[in-house]
Design a protein with these regions (language model features):
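Intrinsic-disorder/low-complexity signal
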Residues: 1-722
Length: 722
């Protein structure tokens, strides 16, 4: 049950109500609260009150489990050492430091011959210098070199609110994730799998709209002896991927495991039933022909003649049977320049119509055809998922400005690339008509609370139209979001622990001006500059390693700061035993250790593809303040030796494409609700309403009526209308 409790706390920042005998636990509860505050967390008043009425043993057990969970959330579950023992003080000039390493190597009897040989060639490999890349002191020695952190008003204090009994909290979390209207990230999908197995015999969501989520739930249902929920052949393919711990999004090939006879029968029966009810769905096989071929090798459909329709699936995959695809019919109409016919046919598949909208508008040669396209969209909009409606609305909003510029493509795994935009412009009048229609459709679906309280800081948070546009962690917001940054010192950190091979990750920060040209950078090749310091290069992490960059925001030249993690050598982010990135904010006079959990504002896992990670960027506003712009991007990079110097042009181009693209935000939805008659008011913590309200903010405030509807980043997906 400890694992389930950790999931609830991580996802909801709610502490399940502990089960235990009554007692006098007030002293232990206060000590628990104090321990939480040392790592940037705090018990809500209700949680503290409830714990105080339980036995001391119950409180202590709860504290031990909870502290372990929140320390991991903040990145405090590992030891963060630094190369330069008193970082950020006394960081040397880069050349001075390298010369010192060479001098020490020449004084080393073992290293001396090799260094002299390298000096004769004029090139020295830093990794051959004994004092380079490895810690020269213990963790305890590093701690002794730093003053204690002085508390400040700006330190993070994340409140843990009291939840219900653990069983109720687990069920609620399962229903929320399974019924999400947006795809979940890989970490949340894995959590859904754990919850689905635990909740297989309990309440189930009325609907599971996202296919990837359905696959994970189906895998749990099958293991529990229940029938899977299937209505397309692709549902069966995704289920097979889930059972093999593969990619349920079908973006990457899955190596199918040997399946038991029971599972093979269930999958074949599912395929047979889907095709028997709707033979046209055989066309979906063509989209994933190779995957179905590989699945057929595991299912042995020839051994089960009672399911002949299942055999047809694999016959289509092998090319032995024809299946006329819907997409083929659409292409034939486009080929005949019949835009009206294409729009009419696509209207029978509303999602495909919305995804083909740009092409339809560009292909329409007459006003009659353009009117037909708009009319088709208006007619079927109520049948399209809210996520797709909002995605197309955002796309149309940016379409006019993007024409002729660079296009940024980001796949579902977060890998990004840039290309020229060679598309023709779409008709402006129709673009505006469609935007108005989608606004009206979204407004129709939104709730209509009498009163909505909004934290102003949440208005610039991008709508989570895909869970894959974010990452698991603390304080993480969806890609494209803007959030305020307050503090004199901005400190980045990366931690990694290699699994099998020597692995070297390099933390860097690129500084760009208003035109996205390079001003400077901080990395192991430039340890110190006007803006700040680098903690030193660590090149091997068998027991884990950390690197830091300290920046004085007031001294930063330029407009943008782009931290990045480059894989210089070794294991990919997905291969390492553990890897995460984050940033801290503090005032100069606070001092403290290089890593102080209560100053951590954001910590996220590094688990994407590619060899260069770009978690977020920081930009200076016109008034001189700073904001974080959330990216969650990965660049393919080079197989080895990735450095900030080698990717600065690509990073600048990507950043420009994202910064100049306007996202649909929470502010967009609240404006629609206000226009529909909801009273929207700015949250004022000084006057908490007594009656139930709907609240949207970055954190759940204390004192709200228990029947209030509360939306925070942890459940922001609930804001997306179905």
């Amino acid at each position: 049950m400890d694992r389930l409790e950790r999931l609830v706390i991580r996802h909801t920042l709610r502490l399940p109500s502990p089960a235990g005998p009554a007692g006098e636990g007030d002293v232990a509860a206060r000590q628990f609260d104090a321990a939480l505050m040392s790592v940037g967390f705090k018990l809500s008043a209700d949680a503290l009150r409830t714990l105080s009425g339980l036995s001391e043993g119950t409180v202590v057990d709860t504290a031990v489990r909870t502290l372990a969970t929140v320390r991991e959330l903040a990145g405090d579950h590992v030891r963060h050492n630094v190369y330069f023992v008193d970082f950020p003080a006394n960081v040397p000039d880069t050349f001075e430091f390298w010369m010192r390493c060479v001098t020490e190597a020449l004084e080393d009897r073992k290293a001396r011959p090799g260094i002299i040989a390298q000096l004769r060639t004029g090139v020295i490999n830093l990794l051959t210098l004994p004092s380079y890349g490895n810690y020269r002191h213990t963790y305890d020695e590093m701690l002794a070199a730093h003053d204690e952190l002085t508390a400040a008003v700006g330190d993070r204090l994340t409140v843990l609110h009291l939840g219900g009994p653990l069983g109720d909290e687990v069920t609620a979390l399962y229903l929320a994730l399974a019924g999400s209207t947006t795809p979940l990230g890989d970490e949340h999908l894995a959590d859904l799998g754990v919850l689905a197995e635990h909740c297989a015999d309990g309440p189930q969501p009325v609907e599971i709209p996202v296919r990837e989520n359905r696959a994970v739930v189906n895998a749990a249902r099958l293991k529990a002896g229940s029938l899977p929920l299937l209505d397309t052949v692709t549902d069966v393919l995704r289920l097979a991927c889930a059972l093999s711990d593969g990619d349920v999004s079908l973006q990457e090939p899955t190596r199918f495991r040997k399946l038991s006879r029971l599972v093979r029968r269930a999958l074949l029966a599912g395929l047979d039933d889907v095709v028997a009810q709707a033979p046209a769905k055989l066309a979906d096989v063509l989209l994933h022909r190779e995957a179905f071929k590989r699945l057929g090798e595991r299912l042995h459909p020839h051994e089960y003649p009672r399911w002949p329709h299942a055999a047809e699936v694999f016959a289509v995959a092998r090319g032995e049977q024809k299946a006329h695809s819907f997409d083929g019919r659409v292409e034939a109409l486009f080929g005949a320049d019949d835009v009206t016919g294409a729009a009419r046919l696509l209207a029978s598949a509303p999602g495909k119509l919305f995804r083909s909208l740009d092409r339809l508008l560009r292909s329409a040669a007459t006003q009659e055809e353009r009117d037909a396209v708009v009319a088709a969209v208006e007619r079927v909009a109520p049948e399209v998922s809210g996520r797709v409606v909002l995605s197309v609305r955002e796309y149309l909003h940016n379409r006019a400005e993007e024409t002729g510029r660079k296009r940024v493509f980001i796949n579902r795994a977060g890998r990004a690339h840039v290309t020229d935009d060679t598309r023709h412009a779409v008709p402006e009048e129709e673009r505006k008509r469609l935007m108005a229609a989608l606004d009206a459709e979204t407004a129709r679906r939104l709730p209509s609370p009498e009163r909505l309280l909004v934290d102003p800081d949440v208005l610039d948070v991008a709508l989570p139209l895909s869970g894959r546009a974010t990452a698991a962690g603390l304080g993480v917001l969806p890609r494209g979001s803007l959030s305020p940054v307050d503090g004199e010192l901005l400190r980045f950190f990366v931690y990694w622990k290699q699994k099998q091979r020597v692995t070297d990750y390099d933390l860097s920060a690129l500084l760009l001006d208003a035109r996205y040209d390079t001003v400077s950078w901080l990395s192991y090749t430039n340890l110190r500059d006007v803006e700040g310091e680098h903690s030193g290069d660590i090149t091997n992490a068998p027991d884990g390693a950390s690197e830091f960059i300290d920046l004085r925001l007031g001294a930063v030249r330029g407009m943008y700061i782009v931290p990045q993690v480059n894989i210089y050598s070794g294991e990919r982010f997905e291969e390492a035993e553990e890897s995460f990135f984050g940033f801290m904010l503090r005032e100069a006079e606070q001092k403290g250790q290089p890593f102080e959990p209560r100053t951590v504002r954001m910590k996220s896992e590094l688990r994407g593809p590619g060899r260069v990670a770009l978690p977020l960027a920081f930009r200076r506003a016109e008034d001189g303040s700073w904001q974080a712009k959330w990216l969650h991007l990965y660049l393919k990079g080079e197989p080895e030796h990735n450095r900030v110097e080698g990717n600065q042009v690509t990073v600048a181009t990507l950043l420009r494409g994202i910064v100049e693209r306007e996202q649909l935000t929470v502010g967009y939805l609240t404006e629609l609700m206000a226009n529909a008659g909801t009273e929207v008011a700015t949250w004022d913590a000084a006057s908490v309403p007594q009656e139930p309200v709907t609240y949207i903010g970055l954190e759940r405030p204390e004192g709200l009526h228990p029947d209030s509807v509360v939306i925070t980043p942890e459940n922001l997906r609930d804001l997306i209308p179905e």
